[in-house]
């Protein structure tokens, strides 16, 4: 029997992060003078760290192992887990997160200033990268999920054309 208890807590974490980022994005849209730097300084670093853990947890669950052990495990993706991540709405929230983080990420990758907010900016960049990794693993070897995510091909192509690949290792 597949243990899916992690789905609810992961869903709650996604909803919380997307809500916070959506609120911050609305503030930015209402006041264009607010910089992305100011926006992210208002984020709680603990929230970002815990969300990084959620993204790694979900990616590892697809393979039935920990994130850091995916390659060495030799496991194939578990189709039931991939399907659950789409059916529970986590995949939709993941796309919203990627959409919200795109502009801030572009600013982060183009700014190498050593500053007090560097740790937060690095965490935001890591969330952006892990979000794309999770999308890749949700669709791996699963045609139904590839079709589901195909509605966002334009978004993925736009991002791939403009993101500095050397920034994401």
What are the language-model segments listed below?
Residues 1-169:
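Elongated alpha-helical scaffolds that mediate protein-protein interactions in large eukaryotic proteins
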């Amino acid at each position: 029997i597949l243990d899916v208890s992690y789905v609810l807590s992961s869903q709650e974490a996604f909803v919380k992060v997307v809500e916070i980022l959506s609120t911050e994005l609305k503030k930015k849209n209402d006041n264009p003078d607010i910089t992305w730097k100011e926006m992210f300084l208002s984020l709680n670093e603990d929230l970002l760290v815990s969300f990084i853990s959620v993204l790694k947890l979900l990616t590892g669950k697809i393979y039935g192992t920990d994130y850091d052990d995916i390659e060495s495990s030799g496991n194939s993706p578990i189709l039931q887990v991939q399907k659950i991540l789409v059916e529970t709405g986590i995949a939709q929230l993941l796309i919203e997160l990627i959409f919200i983080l795109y502009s801030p990420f572009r600013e982060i990758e183009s700014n190498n200033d050593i500053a007090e907010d560097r740790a937060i900016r690095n965490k935001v960049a890591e969330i952006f990268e892990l979000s794309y990794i999770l999308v890749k693993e949700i669709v791996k070897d699963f045609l139904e999920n590839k079709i589901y995510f195909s509605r966002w091909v334009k978004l993925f192509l736009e991002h791939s054309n403009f993101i500095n690949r050397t920034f994401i290792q």
